[in-house]
Amino acid sequence: MEEGVNMDIRPTRIELIRTRRRIRLAKKGLDLLKMKRSALIYEFLQISRTIRGMKENLRKEVVEALNIIKVASVLEGSLALERIANMSSDSRINVNSRNVMGVNIPTLEVSYNLSILSDVYRTVSVPVAIDDSIRRFQKLFYDLILIVEKENSLRNLLMEIDRTKRRSNAIENILIPRLEYQAKMIKMTLDERERDTFTTLKTIKKKIEAEND
């Protein structure tokens, strides 16, 4: 007897029909889970490739931003840089989410409070070299947030891929074999009853024929 098989099921034709229906539904569910897992893996690989490209660009941006701020320091002096840095705008990160195949993917939005370093103020009062540095580092910060967002997405996708795999394995290796075994046992019992009934009827028929003779 297979482990986990429910032998309390009544061996009737209705139960056989129900069990076979459950097998079909389980197989359909398994196909859907496999399709979902494939879609999640595809999304995972796409985001992974995107992150690799973003990190390569980020390294270049860091080098460029550092070079630009060095130039600004030489042209305008370190004191001017510190004065502008102390006036820097505050930034806020808003966390939202989107749904991909049932997985919540975090989305991060960066907003800046430009009440001090407004575009107008920067155009009039901030030297071009320092203003260029500000823009570069703002973009650097924004790109870094995007990478963090996508890495969090990868983490969530990976967990869902693992959950989907476990569910698929449970259906494929436990549920379906158990249902198929139950259907087999019910069918064997029904066939045996049918043979017994046929044998009994045949015996009765012979007795009736013998009595008539």
UniProtKB/Swiss-Prot annotation:
What is this protein's record name?
A: A-type ATP synthase subunit D
What organism does the record attribute this protein to?
A: Thermoplasma acidophilum (strain ATCC 25905 / DSM 1728 / JCM 9062 / NBRC 15155 / AMRC-C165)
Kindly give the membrane topology term recorded for this protein.
Answer: Peripheral membrane protein
**Cellular component GO terms, alphabetical:** plasma membrane
Give the matching HAMAP family. Answer: ATP_synth_D_arch (MF_00271)
In Gene Ontology terms, what is a biological process of this protein? proton motive force-driven plasma membrane ATP synthesis
InterPro entries assigned: V_ATPase_D
Main location group: membrane
Record-linked Gene3D superfamilies: 1.10.287.3240
Instruction: Provide the assembly information.
Output: Has multiple subunits with at least A(3), B(3), C, D, E, F, H, I and proteolipid K(x).
Pfam families cross-referenced by the UniProt entry = ATP-synt_D
Gene it is expressed from:
atpD
Q: What does this protein do?
A: Component of the A-type ATP synthase that produces ATP from ADP in the presence of a proton gradient across the membrane.
Determine the domain of life of the protein's source.
Answer: Archaea
- Compartments, record wording: Cell membrane
- Keyword DNA repair tagged: no
Q: Which family does this protein fall into? A: Belongs to the V-ATPase D subunit family.
